């Protein structure tokens, strides 16, 4: 089974509309013949908070800065756990994944992060959609590349996410 993972439901539905086979809508996916289209809803994972690494970081102290974990941890976002668990379950039966995140660095990060978190090691292709018309989707399906070709985008965006700066949305910033 090929598992297509879109960044959002609207893209998943547009993609399912052009795939061959009879369509069966389920709660968090659409089955198209023998394949499945699933979707995220923005980020399904977030960086763990400093206190998740060590309770001493629960209160900000200048002498503890910078906080640089040996390895960064992710955690599931409560409001999207159901989607993540659905994707994880579908991955168990997948022979291949088609990464259909948005055609930008954040879209690359979003789906790659899910695949890494779920332990997916199988073949993965990258579907870059710039338009959701049926013709544009069919063209993009014919021109997919190996997802490994976009590993640099994933690593760059992941490293930017881990920097502490003005746009930090968590307790990683003392200014939040």
What positions do the PLM features span?
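Intrinsically disordered, low-complexity regulatory segments
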Residues: 1-161
């Amino acid at each position: 089974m090929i598992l297509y993972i879109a960044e959002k439901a609207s893209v998943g539905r547009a993609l399912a509309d052009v795939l061959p086979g009879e369509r069966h809508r389920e709660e968090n996916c659409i089955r198209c013949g023998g394949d499945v289209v699933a979707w995220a809803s923005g980020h399904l994972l977030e960086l763990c908070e400093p206190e998740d690494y060590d309770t001493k970081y629960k209160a900000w102290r200048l002498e503890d800065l910078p906080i640089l974990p040996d390895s960064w941890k992710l955690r599931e976002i409560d409001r999207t756990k159901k989607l993540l668990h659905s994707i994880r379950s579908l991955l168990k039966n997948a022979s291949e994944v088609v990464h259909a995140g948005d055609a930008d660095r954040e879209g690359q990060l979003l789906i790659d992060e899910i695949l890494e978190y779920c332990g997916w090691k199988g073949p993965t292709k990258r579907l870059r959609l710039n338009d959701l018309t049926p013709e544009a989707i069919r063209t993009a399906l014919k021109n997919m590349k190996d997802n490994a070709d976009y590993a640099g985008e994933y690593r760059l965006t992941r490293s930017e996410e881990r920097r502490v700066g003005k746009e930090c949305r968590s307790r990683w910033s003392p200014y939040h």
